[in-house]
A protein has these predicted regions:
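C-terminal outer-membrane beta-barrel translocator/porin domains of Gram-negative envelope proteins
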Residues: 1-118, 124-130, 134
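Outer-membrane beta-barrel "beta-signal"
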Residues: 11, 91, 156-162, 176-187
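Secondary-structure boundary/capping motif
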Residues: 65-68, 114, 153, 178-182
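A short pocket-lining beta-strand/turn micro-motif at the edge of beta-sheets
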Residues: 106-108, 120-124, 150-154, 162-167, ...
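Short glycine-rich, acidic/polar surface loops and turns
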Residues: 111-113, 143-145, 153-158
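C-terminal beta-signal and adjacent terminal beta-strands/loops
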Residues: 129-149, 175, 187
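Short small-residue beta-strand/loop micro-motif enriched in glycine and branched aliphatics
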Residues: 135-137, 165-168
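Short, exposed beta-strand-loop hairpins at the edges of beta-sheets
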Residues: 170-173
Length: 187
């Protein structure tokens, strides 16, 4: 698998979003579908189709308690660069694992979070993440072993709402115990 070359592509995305708040949703859903086509005909070095679907669902439980669920799936057909593979691991997908630890042409993932108030503008989070990537041809990435097994983690986190957006600190227990600090919402 070559990581050098030009990727030229078109992407079509459709999004339905009725969440009550972009940064800290307590009800509603966001559902998105994306289809990407890249090809030599566009002047690129890779011919591929990439399909991605994601659903985010939020349920207010009362008194500031929220249940949030994210489901994702994806499929790539054709030849893509290493950088265009699906990846899981790190603060946005599988907390408790290294960033982009898992790569593949096929992917599914899920996150379930229970969010609860601690103080004004401070929220606690209990979470579990699960997912898998696979579908890389044997030997395409010499140092990578394709593995379709389910990887999962559990953890706790804290959210601080600031004027410039949310700040997140999560501790995930996966194959490693790892802290993740980041800005913005995970989902």
């Amino acid at each position: 698998m070559d990581n050098f070359g030009t990727t030229n592509s078109f992407t079509f995305t459709h999004v339905f979003d009725n969440r009550d708040n972009y940064f800290n949703a307590s009800k509603g859903r966001r559902i998105s579908f994306a289809a990407q086509w890249g090809g030599h005909g566009l002047g690129g070095d890779y011919d591929f189709y990439k399909f991605t679907a994601e659903g985010r669902f939020y349920k207010a439980l009362g008194n500031g308690h929220i249940l949030a669920l994210r489901l994702m799936g994806g499929y790539i057909d054709g030849d893509v660069s290493y950088g265009n593979l699906f990846d899981l691991g790190g603060s946005d997908t599988l907390r408790g694992y290294e960033d982009d630890q898992f790569k593949g042409k096929k992917m599914y993932a899920a996150t379930l979070e229970y969010r609860f108030p601690i103080a004004k503008k401070v929220q606690g989070v209990l979470f579990t993440d699960a997912g898998s990537t696979w579908g890389i041809d044997e030997g395409k990435i010499p140092w990578y072993t394709d593995d379709d097994s389910l990887n999962w983690s559990v953890g706790v986190g804290i959210r601080l709402q600031t004027p410039i957006g949310p700040i997140r600190l999560d501790y995930g227990h996966g194959d490693r115990n790892k802290f993740n600090f980041s800005f913005g919402t995970q989902f």
